[in-house]
Amino acid sequence: MRTTRWLLATALLTAAVPALAASTGSFSTQRLSNVDKALSSDAFQGRGTAAPIEPTVIKYIADQLRAAGVQPGGDVVNGQRTWFQKVPLLQSEIVGTPEISLNENGTVLSLRQGTDLAVLAPLNGANRVDIQNAPLVFVGYGVDAPERGWNDFKGEDMHGKILVELVNDPDFEAQPGEAVAGKFGGKAMTYYGRWTYKYQEAARQGALGVILIHETAPASYGWEVVQNSNTNAQFDIVRENPGATHTELESWIQRPLAAQLFERSGLDLDKAKVAARSSTFRPIPLKATLSAHYAARPQVIESHNVAGILPGKKYPDETIIYSAHWDHLGNGKPDATGDRIYNGAVDNGTGVSELIEQARVFAAGPGPDRSVLFLAVTG
């Protein structure tokens, strides 16, 4: 790979767009709408990652980028640059129904997959999860951010434990005057607030698993999204040591059930949330253990990014990247009408349609000084 200085950008039409439009022509809302409608139509079957429909989806995106006037920016095959980049992914699926239970002072409570809890297929490479009576501990937001003066773990040993955590950043629900207000930038979520970070940090801490407490406002989506996106096949990049990034158990729990769990431990969830907004917060053991038993089917599969590029005139080895993910949930649990297709107009048909329209406007302009890569990514 040649040495390249990557200048990152997003696929959203941000502050740079008015200046770009003024010099190269207007963005077409009609074209945006047409592409989004096509991508989110039933013909594309919800654009599931590595689903049988993938070749149709990525060909459509490549055709749109070609029509927009950019060049192929993908892998070289037989001496020719293509529109596609091969992406190996670890795919994992739970086999059968997971057996999950809480043991609270001798009382065993079975949890239902998708209804009470959303358990993800393991992405640590394991083909089986067997956890027996692992202790639960509430770790607030599960954040270790030394540059912000924040550490929810306080050096306590998390090995062998299931971490119960809140979604988003410690300042998301901060009230005016609280010391934490603005420490993580306010309402705009940082990476510390994302579930991906929380799983990764838990693995770094040596934890056995994670249970995220779902709340719609801090998560920014309802339980049905958690249910549909987390109880199907899961994907990750292929890692040399996936266990360093993923715990054995990764899951979400419904808030009412979490509140009961705290209550039976002599705690109030709302008060615990307030305590978690303090930099002096320390992990709180809960009076319950968790058991989990299920098989999994991990395998490495191949998916694809779609890449179009405009070479730069002055600095072709410096590349600005605009990106949006093309995949969505595919087929899942049927709705009241029996429809099983999760069409994904907003997530992320809008992003891909914006990406293609940006490519069109750039291509119609005088040509960029730096190369511009338009990347529709998988996974």
Question: What would you call each of these model-derived segments?
Answer:
Residues 26-73, 101-107, 157, 161-189, ...:
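Catalytic-core environment of secreted peptidases
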Residues 114, 204-221, 227-229, 235-305:
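Long, well-ordered, tryptophan-enriched scaffold segments
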Residues 1-10:
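Bacterial N-terminal signal peptides that target proteins for export
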Residues 26-33, 91-95, 128-132, 155-159, ...:
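Extracellular/periplasmic catalytic domains that process cell-envelope and extracellular macromolecules
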Residues 45-177, 284-287, 293-298, 302-303:
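Noncatalytic luminal/extracellular "stalk/propeptide" segments of secretory-pathway proteins
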